[in-house]
A protein has these predicted regions:
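Generic short N-terminal amphipathic or hydrophobic helices
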Residues: 5-6, 18-19, 38, 63
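Bacterial N-terminal signal peptides
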Residues: 16-27
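Conserved HGGG/HGGXW glycine-rich cap/lid loop of the alpha/beta-hydrolase fold
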Residues: 70-117
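Bacterial N-terminal signal peptides that target proteins for export
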Residues: 2-16
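Flexible "cap/lid" subdomain of the alpha/beta-hydrolase fold that forms the substrate-access gate
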Residues: 35-55, 64-66, 106, 113-149, ...
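Boundary at the C-terminal end of the N-terminal hydrophobic targeting segment
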Residues: 28-34
Length: 209
């Protein structure tokens, strides 16, 4: 989960992914600065638009300010952890459905994403630190336990956080990325061997800048 080490790269990647899906009508033409500005404005508008029953606030946790979207009140807490390159907005439909089912639902912008603090140093994005962000979030919310739900890279964060702090979670849901245990060889080594000089997004995002 190496993001915004990065700050400029993460922002441009988010924009690039949006272009792939929103500028299909350009039929291969290069996006202009005006196109980029329009898309970035659309992304910001969607991520900050009011949604019925969903409230936003900043939580101080583990030395950062974390923006959360929350809904519901009295039920068990469900913590929704997004992947890359995403934000709380990826969970907008699930937030409403879970709240309607009686759960308290919280979907944070993870460290380095959205409106949450983005430390400049890559060393501040290790899994132990990210897990501590979520435990600090539970503490700030006054919750002893939660159901952890992760998607994509958020699934990796979800597994590790639950492994580090099993007493704080009653259940774990990992979407898109299954738990594979500890590998015998570093995945980075295997990916470098497999892809060589060819583009692979995980290798690309291990290059600071």
């Amino acid at each position: 989960m190496r993001t915004k080490a990065i700050i400029g790269k993460a922002s441009m990647d988010r924009l690039a992914f949006a272009m792939v899906f929103l500028l299909v009508g350009l039929e291969g033409q290069a996006a202009t600065p005006a196109d980029e500005k329009k898309i970035e404005g659309e992304i910001d508008m969607r991520m900050n638009s009011p949604i019925a029953g969903v409230n936003f606030r900043m939580i101080e946790t583990n030395g950062i300010s974390m923006r959360i979207a929350e809904a519901g009140s009295d039920g068990p807490l469900v913590l929704l952890v997004h992947g890359w390159p995403e934000s709380w907005y990826s969970w907008r439909h699930q937030i409403a459905a879970l709240a309607a089912a009686g759960y308290r639902v919280v979907a944070p912008d993870m460290r380095g994403y959205g409106s949450t603090t983005a430390p400049a140093s890559a060393e501040e994005y290790d899994i132990v630190t990210i897990a501590a962000d979520l435990i600090g979030l539970l503490d700030a919310l006054g919750e002893e336990k939660a159901v952890m739900v992760g998607h994509d890279w958020g699934s990796i964060v979800a597994w590790q956080t639950v492994l580090f702090h099993p007493s704080r979670f009653s259940a774990l849901v990992a979407m898109s990325v299954p738990y594979g245990g500890r590998p015998e060889r570093s995945p980075m080594v295997e990916w470098r061997e497999a892809y060589g000089d060819n583009f692979y997004y995980i290798l690309y995002h291990n290059e600071p800048g």
